[in-house]
Amino acid sequence: MPAQRMRSVIPPYMLRALLTRYAPQRDCALHTLNHVQSLLGNKPLRSPTEKNARAGERSAISTTPERHPTARQTGAQGGAAQQPRRAVDEAYDHLGVTYDFFWQAYRRNSVDNKGLPLVQRALRQGLPEQLSGTASRWCSETATARSSTVSPSPSTLVGHELTHGSDRERSRLIYYQQSGALNESLSDVFGSLVKQFHLQQTADKADWLIGAGLLAKGIKGKGLRSMSAPGTAYDDPLLGKDPQPASMKDYIQTKEDNGGVHLNSGIPNRAFYLAATVLGGFAGKKPVTSGMTRCATKRCRKTPTSDHLRPRHGETRAGLRTKRGDKVQQAWASGWQWSNETAADAQSGYGH
């Protein structure tokens, strides 16, 4: 299973729900689902400016999905945005927030610590209206730290997609089954941390939502995913109910979505949320975040098909070095909630 894949922040199961529940948007949902699936099978495009990057370099681009992302550049590079279009301006601003977060929190020069240019495309072709009131589409090209959107562009999603670029260069987690779910969780974690950094929120004040505000008006939901309570992000007749499990005892075995990478990412997401709130303060600077990062950069580099047990133990050890180590360990344990049957099933065929 190749490690370098394009990602889509909109999980395929949401698009499939629209295909079966909402006839007026069926064609749009099918077109988008086919596009997402084609991205999962393609190699990412390389950035023409990647080799000559300046610190903090970023660009926002307006284009169509069929064209090369640099075909029409309407945002500025390295300075103030010059294009008044809201979509491009917001995209450009969020790239700056993401760069500032990685620099101020971890002293990393861009997501790869090598000054990788941050490129974002504003695509003029939409998702079904139930997924966005402004008909936006999200995808990413992780080799060059690229992501795509049309306004609004929540900072969690920008941080999420750009982190995939860091995942590829640092952890090389296989985008499949448990290691793929961990890959998605790492991006959700840092996407949420970028938002918390931007809003200056402590762990107890953050909403821990991925894609808050992305759902259209009238849809019963808060966002695409909830890190604090997986499975509760939305419950709507058109989208169905958020299917994410919150613990390993509810782990989902499936061949869809690269083995359920967007589904089972809710498990490490909730464990991280519980540990971060126990530690308190700004989650981006806490030992639990460092533990998760170390897992991605060192332990998981050696085992790119890593199962969930490895990051769990690694992050627990990081928490034990704090004054609240016992409480952090308890938080992780309550987040994972293994059952004997699920443990045997989930570990078969993975990891080693």
From Swiss-Prot:
Keyword match Zinc-finger: no
Annotated GO biological process: proteolysis
UniProt EC number: 3.4.24.-
Cofactor: Zn(2+)
Cofactor binding notes: Binds 1 zinc ion.
Entry keywords, A to Z: Hydrolase, Metal-binding, Metalloprotease, Protease, Secreted, Signal, Zinc, Zymogen
Basic and acidic residues bias locations: 48-57, 304-325
SUPFAM superfamilies (UniProt xref): Metalloproteases ('zincins'), catalytic domain
Binding site for Zn(2+): 160, 164, 184
Source superkingdom: Bacteria
Thermal profile of function: Optimum temperature is 50 degrees Celsius.
Residue spans of biased composition, Low complexity class: 71-85, 144-156
Main location: secreted
Localisation: Secreted
Active site: 161, 262
Name of the protein: Extracellular minor metalloprotease
Organism: Serratia marcescens (strain ATCC 21074 / E-15)
Gene giving rise to this polypeptide: smp
